[in-house]
Amino acid sequence: MNTIPPQGSESPRIEPERPGDAREISQLTTAAFAPMPFSDGDEARVIDALREAGALTLSLVALTAEGELVGHIAFSPVRIDDQPGDWYGLGPVSVAPRLQRQGVGSALIATGLDRLRDLSAAGCVLLGNPDYYRRFGFLSDPALTYQGRPNRYFQHLVLKGPPAQGDASFHPAFDGP
């Protein structure tokens, strides 16, 4: 069995999604979210729909030294007050169940945020656990909202310029089939 060594030793290789990775990403995402009580099981479909719409600004994979795909993260454009800009949404992020809580997701997130900075992105938003995402600098702000969701879970990270204000909307792929 191929595994990623524990934190502190060899890290996964993070690189852009390659042609032909879509099926593996879909299978990985389905497996990663299957045991999650908050999941509606739609995450793989969202990634496929973003890819088909040309809306995957960044699609990164984590690979073991042997080349096994064990993680994926997607970033796509978001709109603030229905205006396009340089803000992006993080997610979904998926890690093979046997490798969760071993730093693969953190490596994907950190690399993805660095790549957004390279693209001169203004910021990034997500809907997720504030206790987890705080380590990457994500914060909640009542001036930035998402479809009436609890503000505690809708978070942002400013990469340049002032914080965004208004109501954020993700790509329509997140709205369902």
Report the location of each language-model feature.
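Conserved acetyl-CoA-binding loop-helix of GNAT-fold acetyltransferases
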Residues: 90, 95, 101-114, 126
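C-terminal "cap" of GNAT-fold acetyltransferases
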Residues: 125, 146-177
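Conserved glycine-rich acetyl-CoA-binding loop
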Residues: 68, 96-107, 119, 135-136
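Active-site rim helix/loop that mediates acceptor-substrate recognition in acyltransferases
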Residues: 26, 33-65, 69-79
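Conserved GNAT-family N-acetyltransferase fold
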Residues: 60, 71-73, 88, 93, ...
